[in-house]
């Protein structure tokens, strides 16, 4: 499989480290997964720049350093079952699939889900389950989850997602208004309740209810 040239990949990994992505498993997964497969059209030549890029349905593929920092904050273990809310391009799910036992990823846009499925098949990632659904309600039939990651901003951590997090589990998500800078937070579920840590400022598209009208 053709990917970036060695110099581009080296610069990519250096940029990740310089932004604080230091976990060896996360870096190895991001080195292995070709971001270029998830960026199409006019922006395909910019896949290895540390910047968000537009994709279909008015969505974006997050900048790699943010993907790395969110994945690192999630502290994924090899036996974990992970829920991703907001498949988008599929890039984040592909990285999670290198780290976890099973990944469930949902998106409200069927078009994005179909496109991501094709790339997952190309990469032979057989431990990802994709579906078109309103991710703000999670996946009750598959709960509880060891880890949950949300790639769109909500004003607060959605109650259904908190309920589907295992005791001892971690959720990472951006919270805040969609038209301002948001805060990336990490939620840990304990026997007593939930502990919240603020990690860094971010900008994400809003988490919307319902299904997209893209068919």
Swiss-Prot record:
It is found in: Cytoplasm. Its EC number is 2.1.1.77. Its main location: cytoplasm. It catalyses: [protein]-L-isoaspartate + S-adenosyl-L-methionine = [protein]-L-isoaspartate alpha-methyl ester + S-adenosyl-L-homocysteine. Transmembrane segments: none annotated. One of its GO terms (biological process) is protein modification process. One of its GO terms (cellular component) is cytoplasm. Keywords: Cytoplasm, Methyltransferase, S-adenosyl-L-methionine, Transferase. One of its GO terms (molecular function) is protein-L-isoaspartate (D-aspartate) O-methyltransferase activity. The active site is at residue 62. Belongs to the methyltransferase superfamily. L-isoaspartyl/D-aspartyl protein methyltransferase family. Catalyzes the methyl esterification of L-isoaspartyl residues in peptides and proteins that result from spontaneous decomposition of normal L-aspartyl and L-asparaginyl residues. It plays a role in the repair and/or degradation of damaged proteins. This is Protein-L-isoaspartate O-methyltransferase. It comes from Ruegeria pomeroyi (strain ATCC 700808 / DSM 15171 / DSS-3) (Silicibacter pomeroyi).
């Amino acid at each position: 499989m053709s990917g970036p040239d060695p110099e581009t990949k080296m610069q990519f990994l250096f940029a990740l480290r310089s932004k604080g992505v230091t976990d060896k498993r996360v870096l190895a997964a991001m080195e292995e997964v070709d971001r270029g497969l998830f960026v199409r059209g006019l922006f395909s030549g910019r896949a290895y720049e540390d910047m968000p890029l537009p994709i279909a349905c008015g969505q974006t593929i997050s900048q790699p350093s943010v993907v790395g920092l969110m994945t690192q904050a999630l502290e994924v273990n090899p036996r974990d079952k992970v829920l991703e809310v907001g498949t988008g391009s599929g890039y984040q799910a592909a990285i999670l699939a290198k780290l976890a036992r099973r990944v469930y990823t949902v998106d409200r846009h069927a078009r994005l889900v179909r496109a991501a499925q094709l790339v997952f098949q190309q990469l032979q990632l057989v431990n990802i389950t994709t579906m078109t659904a309103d991710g703000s309600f999670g996946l009750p039939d598959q709960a509880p989850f060891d880890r949950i990651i949300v790639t769109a901003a909500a004003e607060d951590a959605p109650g259904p997602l908190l309920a589907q997090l295992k005791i001892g589990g971690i959720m990472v998500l951006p919270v805040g208004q969609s038209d301002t800078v948001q805060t990336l937070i990490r939620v840990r579920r304990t026997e007593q309740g939930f502990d919240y840590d603020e990690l860094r400022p971010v900008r994400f598209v809003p988490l919307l209810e319902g299904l997209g009208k893209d068919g």
